[in-house]
Amino acid sequence: KKGGQTFDFVNYSLNAATPSEIEQRNRELAAHEAARQSLIRPSREVTIDAARLPLQLISFQDANTTAAEEYNRLAVLLMTTASEQPIKRVLVASAQHGEGRTSVALNLACALSLAQRRVLVAETDLQKPSFLDFLGLSAEVGLTDALAKGISAGSAVVRIQPFGFDVLPTREQVKHPAELLSSPSFGEMLALFDPDYDFILFDSSPLLAVADTSLLVRHADTTVLVIRSGKTTSGQISKAIAPLTPEKILGVVLNRADRIT
C-alpha cells in the first residue's frame, strides 16, 4: 500500500485520431517492440516454474490476487511518474532485513514486464545476496565478478522466462561492498545498461544495516521503501529515510505478509 497516494489512469481514445495519427502510433509501438527485442542481450534465458517459487512471489503465480493487483498499482504509479519526470533507476529499500524487500523488487519487476516495460533487477545487497536461492538459479558470473574482475556486465545478466524481465545476480557475499559500489566501474556499468532498459531496480542492503546503501542513493532516481507492519518502528523509519530527500521517495509498500525474505 502507498499511504496518501492516489492513482491517475490515462485513457487514450482512437475515435478522434486521423488515419495518419493511427499509423504513426503503430510505427511507434513497432519501434518500441523492436527495441525490446534487439537492445537487450542477456547471457542466457532461464524458464522457471512459478508453482515452485516461494509464496512471496505472488505476481509470478496468480495475477488475479489482491496482492498481485497491488504490485500492478505500484507499477502504474512508477510508469505514470516516469512519464512526467526522468525516472529509470529505482532503489527498492527497507530499514532492516526481513521486511520483504527482495520479494517486492522481483514482484514489481514482473508487473512492469507484463506491462511491456524492459526491466533489469540488480542484486546490490552484496553482503547478503539471495536472488539465486530465491529463484532457484545458478550462475557462473555475477555482478561482483563484472565489477571486480573486469568481466562484461552483460555476461552476468539472466532473462527470466516466461515473465520477460532480466536479473543481475550476485553469486557470493562481499566483505567490503562499498569499494565496489563506489568504484567508477559501477557507474560505468549502469551507464551501459541505461539505454537497454526502461527501469533498473536496485535490491539494496537495508538502510540501517550498512552504509553502502547511501552509495546507491546517489545512482537512483527514486526510492520505494518497504516496511513490514509490526516490525519496524517509526523511529527506525525516520532514521532509515534520513539520507533521502522527500522528492526521492516514490512511495511506501506496507508489507503484511507472514512469510518474508
What are these regions (language model features)?
Residues K1-L77:
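Acidic-aromatic/histidine active-site loop/patch
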Residues E45-V76, T80-S83, S94-E99, R117-D198, ...:
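P-loop/Walker-type NTP enzyme "switch/lid" segment
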Residues P86-V90, R101:
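Pre-Walker A (Motif I) flank of P-loop NTPase domains
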Residues V104, L108:
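Hydrophobic positions on the alpha1 helix immediately C-terminal to the Walker A/P-loop
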Residues L112:
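Aromatic pocket-lining residues of Rossmann-like dinucleotide-binding sites
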Residues A146, L168, A220-T261:
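Conserved beta-strand/loop subsegment of P-loop NTPase cores
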